[in-house]
Amino acid sequence: MKSDIEICQTATLIRMKTIASNLGLHDDDITPQGRYKAKVNIDALKHLEDKPSGKLILVTAITPTPLGEGKTVTTIGLAQGLAKLGESVSACIRQPSMGPVFGVKGGAAGGGYSQVAPMEELNLHLTGDIHAITAAHNLASAAIDARIYHEQRLGYNIFSEKNDLPALRIDPTQVVWKRVMDHNDRALRMVTIGKNEDNKTINGYEREDGFDITAASELMAILALATDLQDLRQRIGRIVVAYNLDGLPITTEDLQVAGAMTVTMKFAINPTLMQTLEGVPTFVHSGPFANIAHGNSSIIADNIALKLTDYTVLVATLRGIKANSGLFPLSSGQSLPKALFVPNQEALIAGLDNLHWHIKNCAKYGLPVVVAINRFPEDTQEELDFLADWVTSQSSELNLDVAISEAFGKGGEGTRELAQKVLIACAQETEFTPLYTPDMSLLDKLTAVAIKGYGAERLELSEKAQQQLAMFEQLGYQHLSVCMAKTPASISTDGNIKGAPTDFIVPIRELRLCAGAGFVYALCGNVMTMPGLPEKPAFMNLDIDSNGNITGLS
């Protein structure tokens, strides 16, 4: 079989104006970015608002191996399968970060015959949204250190009188807004800035700082959650970047930088329209880090897609289930054990607890579940049939169906059965049931996620986390939602614990406030917001020929 990039480069694509026109978008709704991608003006929603909304299908996955189990492949393949059945359909996916593209995971355009194209443009820069977020984020960082420098250089009173601005009195030890870049670079996790020679302060005042990957920026989460340009502006203005000497929050609005940050992101609020290899429209927008934010593409892209064209598809793989048996050592950045790719009934049976946990977890929210068994070339029909039969055996107690997906090898033709079963699920009446309500305290919300969501015995907050929790409540942030930042390699907070653990403790070492995005996230265990490169990074495979053709991207 050809490589992903070879398949993509030999595909016949449709001009973007045709894709947009077939969707019902007007010429002035899009701004072409070359032949095969275009920005969709957010104002398109105004002439679409009276149209009925379509069905929203959420694709998630079991506890993954480091290479992922195929959420994007399944999303794209399912969209192509629905199109094969004559349905009006579009896909919505996140924009890939270049960090993982150059690291261990590679690109995020799907794979095989279920890809978004051109995949090299999607994986590398696209329309520059991530760079705009990086620039806006680091503008706030520069504003913080400039304000500290000038206020301390002149003194608070003189600074205020000279510039007709209030002295913010930022505590340099309480700056919570790190800098960002769109690469994996562990050496930048902790840095010292403002270093000078001979006791001078020309380079600013020295303090400890660090870098996160841009996908971990609160701005990325805000872009994904904002509903329009005004909402984006208001959310950016609420971002807390530091605390003053009295312990009170300093926002980007206080720094008077929120407007400039929004201006920098003005173009980024518009989703990018692309297509799958089979010409299915695909909206690509935002890319929040999934383990410290909600990890979905944008609400704006979803709203536009729903007007143009409420159920869960759970992706499982044989290797993913075997990996959750606990019989094989797994390590991020390392190759998967070869034993995961050969028939092993013992490992398959031992790993079923993890799939069962995820099925029940989806069912908690009141949604019907369709399990998509994502087929890999090395999978045997015997093991695939065994897994499908096992899922079917669980359907008597749960609203559940199953289909083997061959999206990778066959595109939309390989997901016809999955698409038919998803359509049946979409015809059902459902009522979404959240784990907690907005009026609950932050502690009760965190406890609900840990106990009701993960099946933990209890929470265990560090002294620092307890102090932060009390401060956030005192400052009036108790109404915010919560997010758990933990390893994706386990249901628990320990990546070495596989399967479906119970009665474990969820340790919270630190809480971080995202007032603009609208949530508080808890750092559980050793979660990194700036990834590092593996021993053999994916960038070693990338090259370009004299004709500009890229090779080695997957």
Curated annotation (Swiss-Prot):
Gene Ontology BP annotations: tetrahydrofolate interconversion
An example Gene Ontology molecular-function term: ATP binding
Keyword Nucleotide-binding attributed: yes
Pathway: One-carbon metabolism; tetrahydrofolate interconversion
Keywords for the protein's UniProt record, in alphabetical order: ATP-binding, Ligase, Nucleotide-binding, One-carbon metabolism
The enzyme's E.C. designation: 6.3.4.3
Cysteines engaged in disulfide bonds, as pairs: none
Domain of life of the source: Bacteria
PROSITE patterns xrefs: FTHFS_1, FTHFS_2
Positions of ATP binding: 65-72
Catalytic activity, reaction form: (6S)-5,6,7,8-tetrahydrofolate + formate + ATP = (6R)-10-formyltetrahydrofolate + ADP + phosphate
One matching Pfam family: FTHFS
HAMAP family in the cross-refs: FTHFS
Family statement: Belongs to the formate--tetrahydrofolate ligase family.
Name recorded for this polypeptide: Formate--tetrahydrofolate ligase
